[in-house]
Structures are given as structure tokens and as C-alpha cells.
Amino acid sequence: MVTAIYPGTFDPLTRGHEDLVRRASGLFDKLIVGVADSRNKKPFFSLEERLTISNEVLGHYPNVHVESFSGLLKDFVRRHDARVIVRGLRAVSDFEYEFQMAGMNRYLLPDVETLFLTPSDQYQFISGTIVREIATLGGDVSKFVFPSVDKWLKEKIAAQG
């Protein structure tokens, strides 16, 4: 049984993230979506909210499990005896950072592979940062996120005044 981990902040989970989960879940026996605590990034949604949102969107995949983690990805990967780390590459600008991270992960976890997946064409330009910016400025992000995520965004923005 091969377990893979798809780590990220998922702030918020977008249609691009779900696209990668859908495709990666077909490649592995078990896919764990690791929602990173990422306090240093000062996320828009709390860790608990991001877990709830991720479970709402991804809960119908039978071999996908959503779980939070903090600290080193290496420790999370070891705890789950995962063999693969899944990462998304939207553009060349993502590649340099992801290449460095893959190299460090290979050093720390020599028996674990990093698999890069590119999003489907319609999702190549979507990022959580862009979605948050559009939403907080009053724009429509419904084409980039699932209805439940759109609702979460609108409620959070309204609560912040």
C-alpha cells in the first residue's frame, strides 16, 4: 500500500487544489492532505476552519484523509510512513522554490519521492492568495472555489467588517 502526502496551507482550498487531490488520489492507495499550521504565514482562516473546509470539499474521496500538522513535513511524512510527497506546479515561478524543497526533502527523507503535478489548464492561474485578495476586495471568486468555500469566504469577510 502506497501512501502519499499532499501538504499545503490551503488558505482557502481552491478548485486547483481539488483538481490535484482528485488526480493524485487515483495514483495512490491513500492520500493524506496535510493542512499545515503555518502560523508564520498568518493565514486568513484558522487551522480548524481550513480543516473543516478541506473536509467539506474532499470528504467524498474514499482514500483521501485530511489532517493537520505543524513542524517539519519530514516528521509528518514519517509518522504516516508515506512514500511520496505530492506538490503542485502552476508556473515556472513555482518551480525554483519547489525544486529546492524537493532537494531538501530528498536529503532529509532519502527513501521518499516528490511528485510534481501540474494543474489542469483551467486552474493554472488560481492560487489561494489571489482568491483571498479578490474576495476581500468584493470580487466574485465562485469560479475558483467550491460553493461551500465561497460561503466561508463571504462569512469571514463580513465578520471582519
Curated annotation (Swiss-Prot):
Gene: coaD
Transition state stabilizer (site feature) positions: H17
Pathway participation: Cofactor biosynthesis; coenzyme A biosynthesis; CoA from (R)-pantothenate: step 4/5
Binding of ATP, residues: T9, F10, H17, G88, L89, R90, E98, Y123, Q124, F125, I126, S127, G128, T129
GO MF annotation, one: pantetheine-phosphate adenylyltransferase activity
Protein name: Phosphopantetheine adenylyltransferase
Source organism of the structure: Janthinobacterium sp. (strain Marseille)
Cited InterPro entries: Cyt_trans-like (IPR004821), PPAT (IPR001980), Rossmann-like_a/b/a_fold (IPR014729)
SUPFAM superfamilies, sorted: Nucleotidylyl transferase
